[in-house]
A protein has these predicted regions:
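Cysteine-centered metal-binding/redox modules
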Residues: 1-171
Length: 171
């Protein structure tokens, strides 16, 4: 998205409760999406001549229904590596999230999976996926057990980087 959130990794977007900031006129309850329309409809905020602006003060401090922790870092990654490379990486992350949700979600892990795919690096997610695919015992597990197994793998990777896979609510 414009601001560094990744729509394809957002539970609201996945549930079709949000059109994303590209949803067109009238869908911009977000001040950053409105701002983009007022500044020539830039694809990413870093492309705006006024970036960074006051809208980015404390933007990573708290989460909503999606983690906000990497917004600035993700915008910098897109700026540094190029939008095409950044978007290609996000597409791969969306595919991995889809695998987790389609095959291993017991109905209680969607938020955890979305947060993990947002915060972990693509290579780390690919390593988790490789481990899952090469575990011949996984087919004998119930969906609930599979879901717990995947959650544990993701939490273990996150723990090595001191990443908490929970949303941070404003107090």
């Amino acid at each position: 998205s414009l601001c560094g959130l990744n729509c394809g990794l957002c539970p609201m977007f996945l549930n079709k409760n949000c059109p994303g900031c590209g949803g067109g006129e009238g869908n911009q309850s977000c001040k950053i999406a409105r701002c983009s329309m007022e500044h020539g409809s830039v694809q990413y905020c870093f492309q705006c001549s006024e970036h960074p602006c006051e809208k980015y003060d404390h933007i990573d401090d708290f989460d909503s229904f999606i983690t906000h922790r990497r917004r600035k870092a993700d915008l910098e990654k897109a700026r540094h590596s190029g939008v095409e490379a950044y978007n290609a990486e996000q597409i791969e992350k969306v595919k991995i999230l889809d695998i987790f949700l389609s095959n291993y979600n017991d109905g209680r892990k969607k938020t955890l999976f979305c947060i993990a795919v947002n915060l972990l690096e693509l290579q780390e997610l690919q390593a988790v996926l490789w481990e899952i695919e090469h575990n011949s015992d996984i087919e004998m597990l119930t969906l609930k057990e599979k879901s717990a197994y995947i959650a544990r793998l993701l939490k273990d990777v996150a723990a090595t980087k001191n990443i908490d896979l929970k949303l941070r609510k404003k107090k």
